[in-house]
């Protein structure tokens, strides 16, 4: 249970830090810094533990590279959703359903068994996404961030990845990143499936190094193409927040891995699944975000579904 709590805390804090990073430094710089720090930590672990790469053949390596690129797509979609003004609690809850995507793929492709609790969890998570993503009816659910409050709602006016654009007022803050959050969940889910399928053969550390190394390599290769279009002024704090997001995300991943190694997979997965509660509370307290009743019910359904998937 302790590993699950540490993982939940790490991933929850990482989501809050990611929002600050995305809105201060832009998506590209934020993801590059966060992913780069993650690779540095993995390299340090590799130097300490000296894992074997004997299981990383050509086919396995290509699959892990694919997992890394899918993960990169997920990160870009997640940070972009936050940069566009999506509510961090809502975006985090929807993107967290990637576990359900991976579970369904494991059942459909690998023939793994999904219990009753897991099945109910998948249904709850999908229903929660439908509620959270639905447009509010005219005159209903008007308690959202962009309708009555009109306070600190922020949107993005410059649609260039990596650019830190000027803020502008929007009408519905909490729905701005929903489509991107769904893309994030799908990318994470498919990437996680590939990573989970080939990690036993390659070893978890070797697999993580190949996957994360591929994503950072692509980001570095894209740097010359985007350099002239980036807004470098005022991004120092954003880079610091991105580093914090990468560090806390790595803490969550390591805690989750340790929980699995200790034979506490179900408990660790179930407890860590509640991590969207942290960005949800953080969004309300730190950023004055307010979800509509329908969206809040959807988020609760998503979290409940994730817990059941972890137990199932």
Regions found by a protein language model. Give the residues of each.
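A helix-boundary/kink motif common to multi-pass secondary transporters
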Residues: 26-27, 86-87, 110-115, 203-204, ...
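Transmembrane alpha-helical core positions of polytopic small-molecule transporters
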Residues: 11-12, 67-75, 98-99, 185-189, ...
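Alpha-helical transmembrane segments of compact multi-pass small-molecule transporters, enriched
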Residues: 36-44, 94-108, 214-218, 252-255, ...
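Juxtamembrane C-cap of transmembrane helices in multi-pass membrane transport proteins
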Residues: 13-25, 76-86, 94, 190-202, ...
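Structural signature of hydrophobic alpha-helical transmembrane segments
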Residues: 1-11, 55-71, 114-127, 203-217, ...
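Membrane-interface interhelical linkers
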Residues: 1-9, 17-18, 23-28, 33-66, ...
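Hydrophobic transmembrane alpha-helices of multi-pass small-molecule transport proteins
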Residues: 104-105, 117-136, 150-163, 294-311
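Hydrophobic alpha-helical transmembrane segments in multi-pass integral membrane proteins
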Residues: 42-53, 102-117, 186-200, 248-265, ...
């Amino acid at each position: 249970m302790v590993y699950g709590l540490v993982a939940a805390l790490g991933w929850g804090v990482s989501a809050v830090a990611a929002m600050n990073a995305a809105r201060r430094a832009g998506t590209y710089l934020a993801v590059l810094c966060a992913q780069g720090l993650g690779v540095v930590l993995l390299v340090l672990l590799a130097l300490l533990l000296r894992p074997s790469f004997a299981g990383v053949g050509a086919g396995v390596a290509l699959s892990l590279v694919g997992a890394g690129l899918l993960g990169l797509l997920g990160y870009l979609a997640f940070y972009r959703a936050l940069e566009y003004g999506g509510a961090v609690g809502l975006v985090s809850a929807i993107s967290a359903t990637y576990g359900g995507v991976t579970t369904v793929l494991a059942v459909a492709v690998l023939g793994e068994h999904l219990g009753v609790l897991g099945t109910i969890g998948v249904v709850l998570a999908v229903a929660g996404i439908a509620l959270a993503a639905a447009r509010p009816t005219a005159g209903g659910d008007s308690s959202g961030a962009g309708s009555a409050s009109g306070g600190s709602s922020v949107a993005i006016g410059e649609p260039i990845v990596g650019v830190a654009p000027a803020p502008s007022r929007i009408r519905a803050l909490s729905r701005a990143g929903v489509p991107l959050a769904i893309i994030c969940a799908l990318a994470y889910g498919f990437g996680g499936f590939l990573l989970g399928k080939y990690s036993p053969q390659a070893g978890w550390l070797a697999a993580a190094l190949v996957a994360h190394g591929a994503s950072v390599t692509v980001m570095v290769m894209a740097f010359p193409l985007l350099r002239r279009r980036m807004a470098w002024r005022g991004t120092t704090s954003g880079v610091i927040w991105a580093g914090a997001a990468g560090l806390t995300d790595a803490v969550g991943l390591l805690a989750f891995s340790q929980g699995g190694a200790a034979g506490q997979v179900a408990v660790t997965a179930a407890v860590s699944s509640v991590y969207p509660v942290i960005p949800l509370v953080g969004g309300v307290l730190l950023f004055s975000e307010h979800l509509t009743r329908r969206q809040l019910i959807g988020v609760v359904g998503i979290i409940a579904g994730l817990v059941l998937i972890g137990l199932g």
